[in-house]
Amino acid sequence: SLSHTDPDWQWNEFFSTENDSVVWDSVIMSGASHGATTSARFALHQRVDRVVMFCGPRDQYESWQSLPSATPKERFIVLSHVLDTGWTGDNYCRSWEMLGLNKYGPLVDVDLVSPPFGNSRRLITDADVNHDEKRAHSCVTPGKAAVKDNQGRYVHAAVWRYLFDHPVDQVGQAVEPDTNCRKELR
């Protein structure tokens, strides 16, 4: 088991010795793109600590996002770049509102607002990706496409800490659904 092969990482926190199963309340589900969709769908059926979605979820023709959720919706947090085609095509704003995330704060541009971003669950960035929509899709996660400053530091490091560490009981002020977000995309 992981707790035996790498005990320094304290894997026991995530496993129940009583019934040899995962302690899902301690697990953070996270994914990018299709992984964001998978993480959100999983969390509707199984309560988890929180759900961190990068550049997603994108499921513009379905309505599963509005189903009852085993994981409280204030535990869902999203980040996307505004040049990502999922954003420009209104796919993300539709999914985010169907998840009810507007109840936990307005859209917040992380390039203009400092942590804790008004405690919002809906974060966007307009970081410079040289107008490359493909890079925009992947720049919000750590890796080679992530945006760095002149010293080579990730510009979204504080955002990532917020997504994974911010207390889930601290939420932003509810706002009305965005009238500019197209809900019917067929």
Where are these regions (language model features)?
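Catalytic active-site module of serine/aspartate enzymes centered on a nucleophile-bearing elbow/loop
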Residues: 124-186
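Surface-exposed acidic, glycine-flexible loop patches that form ligand/cofactor-binding
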Residues: 16-21, 44, 65-70, 169
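Gly/Ala-rich beta-loop-alpha elbow adjacent to hydrolase catalytic centers
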Residues: 28-39
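Gly/Ser-rich "nucleophile elbow"/oxyanion-hole loop immediately N-terminal to the catalytic nucleophile
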Residues: 2-28
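Extracytoplasmic/secreted proteins, especially bacterial periplasmic and envelope-associated proteins
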Residues: 37-38, 91-94, 158
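Conserved hydrolase catalytic core segment
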Residues: 41-50
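The feature captures the conserved acid-bearing segment of alpha/beta-hydrolase catalytic domains
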Residues: 49-148
